[in-house]
Amino acid sequence: MPQLNPKPWFMILFFSWVIFLTIIPTKIINHIQPNDPTQVDAKEHKNDTWNWPW
């Protein structure tokens, strides 16, 4: 019964985990943050107070 021979199944399992642990995480990391964030220029906003006569 060839399905009981562990040698080919072990290689399939091993190579599938190698692909899972090496190739897939790098592809996921590249899609999480594809570009480096750029800092937006910090501008002070003009905050005028309202002088309402109460």
From Swiss-Prot:
GO molecular function terms listed in the Swiss-Prot or TrEMBL record: proton transmembrane transporter activity
GO biological process, one term: proton motive force-driven ATP synthesis
Entry-linked InterPro entries: ATP8_metazoa, ATPase_protein_8
Disulphide-bonded residues: none
Membrane topology value: Single-pass membrane protein
Compartments where located: Mitochondrion membrane
Keywords: ATP synthesis, CF(0), Hydrogen ion transport, Ion transport, Membrane, Mitochondrion, Transmembrane, Transmembrane helix, Transport
Region (Disordered): 35-54
Pfam families according to UniProt: ATP-synt_8
GO cellular component, one term: mitochondrial membrane
Complex formation: Component of the ATP synthase complex composed at least of ATP5F1A/subunit alpha, ATP5F1B/subunit beta, ATP5MC1/subunit c (homooctomer), MT-ATP6/subunit a, MT-ATP8/subunit 8, ATP5ME/subunit e, ATP5MF/subunit f, ATP5MG/subunit g, ATP5MK/subunit k, ATP5MJ/subunit j, ATP5F1C/subunit gamma, ATP5F1D/subunit delta, ATP5F1E/subunit epsilon, ATP5PF/subunit F6, ATP5PB/subunit b, ATP5PD/subunit d, ATP5PO/subunit OSCP.
PANTHER family: ATP SYNTHASE PROTEIN 8
Function: Subunit 8, of the mitochondrial membrane ATP synthase complex (F(1)F(0) ATP synthase or Complex V) that produces ATP from ADP in the presence of a proton gradient across the membrane which is generated by electron transport complexes of the respiratory chain. ATP synthase complex consist of a soluble F(1) head domain - the catalytic core - and a membrane F(1) domain - the membrane proton channel. These two domains are linked by a central stalk rotating inside the F(1) region and a stationary peripheral stalk.
Protein name stated in the entry: ATP synthase F(0) complex subunit 8
